[in-house]
């Protein structure tokens, strides 16, 4: 997909770089697969801010995505590709032979009219979903389950994929884009190929207001605050008081390990690249 650099007709347009995909549907989304998507403004049920830098943004409907791909043996045709404001990847509206329509993540190279299928006997072809025990070693996959039947949780954003390295003892070994190597049950499903719209990472919003459209509020540095607001606040000039970087609540940050140990840690063969 080509990248479009905006003409510098104003300061806000000067640095804008957009991803242009002429194959995306230009009309309204498929209404039966839309749900209300209320905004919280980062507040909990007491009205207190629990997540900073959240608020505003354009109204959006949530597109119900089929992450389970459990209509086995029923062929489907991709009707159209669509933009989804809730994720970096594009989505496909697929029509099954029994008349049902569903949204799925758009794999790389997908186009209207392509045939896809789910199930153990599906062909090894981009967009087809099947248990990883039936996928050859070395295949690139995306939309990977971590528990059989739960739905895809790994490799769901634009340009993402994982590679199957080995299969043994009821598990498959995957190498993720982060460099992490981990084992997943072989009965978990995955979709062949990689997610499309990899150029998403090359776009440039161009101005602060574009982030506000996405519901992202400004991030103020602690050293720019007063002492009452942040441990780094106050002082004459820029100084953090000689302490290590901390959050507004005094929790060490920038290097402090925050990941809790989990029972499934034993399935991680190699940690991700730093």
From Swiss-Prot:
Biased composition (Low complexity): 39-48
InterPro entries the UniProt entry points to: NA-bd_OB-fold (IPR012340), Rib_uL2_dom2 (IPR014722), Ribosomal_uL2 (IPR002171), Ribosomal_uL2_bac/org-type (IPR005880), Ribosomal_uL2_C (IPR022669), Ribosomal_uL2_CS (IPR022671), Ribosomal_uL2_dom3 (IPR014726), Ribosomal_uL2_RNA-bd_dom (IPR022666)
Keyword flag RNA-binding: yes
Keywords: Ribonucleoprotein, Ribosomal protein, RNA-binding, rRNA-binding
Annotated GO biological process: cytoplasmic translation
Pfam families recorded: Ribosomal_L2, Ribosomal_L2_C
GO CC terms in record: large ribosomal subunit
GO molecular function, one term: transferase activity
Region (Disordered), start-end ranges: 28-53, 223-274
Cited PROSITE patterns: RIBOSOMAL_L2
Biological role stated in the UniProt entry: One of the primary rRNA binding proteins. Required for association of the 30S and 50S subunits to form the 70S ribosome, for tRNA binding and peptide bond formation. It has been suggested to have peptidyltransferase activity; this is somewhat controversial. Makes several contacts with the 16S rRNA in the 70S ribosome.
Subunit note: Part of the 50S ribosomal subunit. Forms a bridge to the 30S subunit in the 70S ribosome.
Family (UniProt): Belongs to the universal ribosomal protein uL2 family.
Name of the protein in its database record: Large ribosomal subunit protein uL2
Biological classification of the source: Bacteria, Pseudomonadati, Pseudomonadota, Gammaproteobacteria, Alteromonadales
């Amino acid at each position: 997909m080509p990248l479009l650099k905006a003409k510098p007709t104003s300061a806000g347009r000067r640095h804008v770089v957009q991803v242009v995909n002429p194959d995306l549907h230009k009309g309204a989304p498929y209404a039966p697969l839309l749900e209300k998507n209320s905004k919280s403004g980062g507040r909990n049920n007491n009205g207190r801010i629990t997540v900073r830098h959240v608020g505003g943004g354009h109204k959006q409907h949530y597109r119900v995505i089929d992450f389970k791909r459990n209509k086995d043996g029923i062929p489907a045709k991709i009707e159209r590709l669509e933009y989804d404001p809730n994720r970096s990847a594009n989505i496909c509206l697929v029509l099954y032979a029994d008349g049902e329509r569903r949204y799925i993540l758009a794999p790389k190279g997908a186009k209207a009219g392509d045939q896809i299928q789910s199930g153990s006997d599906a062909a090894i072809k981009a967009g087809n979903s099947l248990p990883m025990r039936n996928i050859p070693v070395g295949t690139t996959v995306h939309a990977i389950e971590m528990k059989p039947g739960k739905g895809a949780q790994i490799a769901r954003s634009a340009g993402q994929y994982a590679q199957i390295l080995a299969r043994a003892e009821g598990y498959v070994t995957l190498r993720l884009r982060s460099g992490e190597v981990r084992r997943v049950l072989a009965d978990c499903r995955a979709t062949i190929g990689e997610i499309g719209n990899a150029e998403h990472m090359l776009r440039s919003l161009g101005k602060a207001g574009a982030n506000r459209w996405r519901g992202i509020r400004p991030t103020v540095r602690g050293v720019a605050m007063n002492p009452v607001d942040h441990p780094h606040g106050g002082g004459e000039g820029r100084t953090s008081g000689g302490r290590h970087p901390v959050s507004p609540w005094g929790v060490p940050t920038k290097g402090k390990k925050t990941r809790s140990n989990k029972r499934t840690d034993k399935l991680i063969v190699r940690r991700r690249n730093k």
